[in-house]
């Protein structure tokens, strides 16, 4: 039987950090790109310019609007999902979305949202043909 090599106990001192080598674009290594954050900012800005062409929006206000759109989207999607489950359907259709909007948004706001949504779906359907 061959003798076993002795193992040195691990030193408790952290390993010395070497300065990172500078990488250039010509070295062939890919630079890590930033992860893309999806927001509704461009769409919010377009709607703002349609309604108030001479008005701007701050970054903080845009962030608030983006959070608002995400919140409403999640509420409607959640309610539509429940409605589909109640009716034993695995697909959320325009009908579930419309009913969810009526349940979530109050009074006149729901009526306007439903009419605008119907108009958008009609426009999309006619463009698809």
UniProtKB/Swiss-Prot annotation:
Per UniProt, location of the Glycyl lysine isopeptide (Lys-Gly) (interchain with G-Cter in SUMO) cross-link in this chain: 7-8, 17-18
Transmembrane segments: none
Coiled coil: none
SUPFAM superfamilies per UniProt: Histone-fold
Matching InterPro entries: Histone-fold, Histone_H2A/H2B/H3, Histone_H2B, HISTONE_H2B_site
Cross-link Glycyl lysine isopeptide (Lys-Gly) (interchain with G-Cter in ubiquitin) residue location(s): 123
Sequence positions bearing Phosphoserine: 11
Modified residues (N6-acetyllysine): 7-8, 12, 17
Post-translational modification: Monoubiquitinated by the UBC2-BRE1 complex to form H2BK123ub1. H2BK123ub1 gives a specific tag for epigenetic transcriptional activation and is also prerequisite for H3K4me and H3K79me formation. H2BK123ub1 also modulates the formation of double-strand breaks during meiosis and is a prerequisite for DNA-damage checkpoint activation. Phosphorylated by STE20 to form H2BS10ph during progression through meiotic prophase. May be correlated with chromosome condensation.
GO molecular function, one term: structural constituent of chromatin
Entry's localization field: Nucleus; Chromosome
Gene3D superfamilies found in the cross-reference section: Histone, subunit A
Annotated Basic and acidic residues bias: 1-19
Region (Disordered): 1-38
Xref: Pfam families: Histone
A single Gene Ontology CC term: nucleus
Keywords noted in UniProt: Acetylation, Chromosome, DNA-binding, Isopeptide bond, Nucleosome core, Nucleus, Phosphoprotein, Ubl conjugation
UniProt function note: Core component of nucleosome. Nucleosomes wrap and compact DNA into chromatin, limiting DNA accessibility to the cellular machineries which require DNA as a template. Histones thereby play a central role in transcription regulation, DNA repair, DNA replication and chromosomal stability. DNA accessibility is regulated via a complex set of post-translational modifications of histones, also called histone code, and nucleosome remodeling.
Family: Belongs to the histone H2B family.
Subunit text: The nucleosome is a histone octamer containing two molecules each of H2A, H2B, H3 and H4 assembled in one H3-H4 heterotetramer and two H2A-H2B heterodimers. The octamer wraps approximately 147 bp of DNA.
The protein's name in its UniProt record: Histone H2B.2
Organism from which the protein derives: Debaryomyces hansenii (strain ATCC 36239 / CBS 767 / BCRC 21394 / JCM 1990 / NBRC 0083 / IGC 2968) (Yeast)
Lineage per the UniProt record: Eukaryota, Fungi, Dikarya, Ascomycota, Saccharomycotina
Name of the gene encoding the protein in the UniProt record: HTB2
């Amino acid at each position: 039987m061959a003798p076993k090599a002795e193992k040195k106990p691990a030193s408790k001192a952290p390993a010395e950090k070497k300065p990172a080598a500078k990488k250039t674009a010509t070295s062939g290594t890919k630079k890590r790109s930033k992860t893309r954050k999806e927001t509704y900012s461009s769409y919010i800005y377009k709607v703002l310019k349609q309604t108030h062409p001479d008005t701007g929006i701050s970054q903080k206000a845009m962030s608030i609007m983006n959070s608002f759109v995400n919140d409403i989207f999640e509420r409607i999607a959640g309610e539509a999902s429940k409605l589909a489950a109640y009716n034993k359907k695995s697909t959320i259709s325009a009908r579930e979305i419309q009913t969810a909007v009526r349940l979530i948004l109050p009074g006149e706001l729901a009526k306007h949202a439903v009419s605008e949504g119907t108009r958008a779906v009609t426009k999309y359907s006619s463009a698809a043909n």
